């Protein structure tokens, strides 16, 4: 497989895999343009489809972790006809090569405890590749890491991520433009909540400093209900209404 590194100079003409076109793609691309200056790398297959890795120096990651000297993987996604050909391994190998070249301690990434969850990495794949759990959030989301330096201090969640909670009742959503699907679905859920009289508050995170102190281990999409973390899975309006009815 041939790969392309999406950079500031070519992003306007290249697709970004998870959003091929439309306004949701533009929102994601604008977010990426700002992150490139902070060291973000977006590396994808030359073939059209969902096959890419996105990572950034952990100091600039939009998640509440203490991981100075590490690379943080925002997303590693291979699906559809491109799945099952070893491309995930190739993408990860490129990230590790880059980490070594930069003299990083290693790489880290979020996953669910024990099983694959939507919008999180597969823990079985990571374990097979040598990753270990460095920290665990109360909501069952783990921080996994693969060290390149034996003496490196493992990355950790900040307390706000390790013990996720909010004070408000009803539904509270924190989200960013890191995932293009939020651009489409968050307004749909807001509208559905309003129509059905469901208390719902959406907080759009637009700054790194805010993201690094969100009361959840994920910031791309973190939904709370009556103070408790519910899911990192981006909800459609129908899925949200079903959840609200439970």
Residue ranges and their predicted role:
Residues 1-48, 159-161, 169, 181, ...:
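Short amphipathic alpha-helix that is part of the acyltransferase structural core
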Residues 44, 48-59, 72, 77:
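Conserved beta-strand in the GNAT
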Residues 78, 84-100:
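Conserved acetyl-CoA-binding loop-helix of GNAT-fold acetyltransferases
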Residues 138-163:
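C-terminal "cap" of GNAT-fold acetyltransferases
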Residues 110, 127-144, 230-233:
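Conserved catalytic-core motifs of GNAT/GCN5-like acyltransferases
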Residues 226-246:
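Non-catalytic, surface beta->alpha helical segment in thiol-disulfide oxidoreductase systems
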Residues 99-117:
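Conserved GNAT acetyl-CoA-binding A-motif
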Residues 61-73, 83:
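A conserved beta-turn-beta hairpin within the catalytic core of GNAT-like acetyltransferases
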């Amino acid at each position: 497989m041939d790969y392309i590194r999406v950079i500031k100079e070519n992003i306007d003409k290249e697709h970004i895999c998870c959003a091929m076109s439309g306004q949701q793609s533009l929102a994601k691309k604008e977010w990426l343009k700002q992150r490139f200056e902070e060291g973000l790398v977006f590396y994808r297959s030359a073939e059209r489809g969902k096959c890419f890795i996105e990572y950034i120096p952990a100091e600039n990651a939009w998640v509440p972790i203490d991981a100075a000297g590490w690379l943080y993987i925002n997303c590693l996604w291979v699906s559809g006809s491109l799945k099952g050909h070893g491309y995930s391994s190739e993408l990860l190998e490129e990230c590790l090569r880059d980490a070594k070249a930069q003299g990083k301690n290693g790489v880290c990434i979020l996953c669910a405890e024990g099983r694959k969850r939507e919008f999180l990495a597969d823990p079985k794949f990571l374990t097979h590749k040598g990753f270990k759990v460095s920290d665990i959030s109360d909501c069952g989301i783990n921080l996994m890491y693969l060290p390149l330096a034996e003496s490196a201090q493992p990355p950790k969640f900040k307390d706000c991520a390790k013990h996720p909670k909010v004070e408000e009742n009803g539904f509270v959503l924190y989200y960013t433009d890191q995932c293009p699907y939020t651009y489409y679905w968050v307004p749909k859920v807001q509208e559905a909540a309003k129509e059905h009289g469901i208390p719902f508050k959406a907080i759009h995170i637009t700054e790194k400093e805010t993201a690094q102190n969100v009361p959840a281990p994920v910031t791309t999409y973190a939904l709370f209900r009556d103070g408790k973390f519910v899911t990192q899975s981006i909800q459609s309006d129908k899925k949200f209404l079903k959840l609200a009815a439970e």
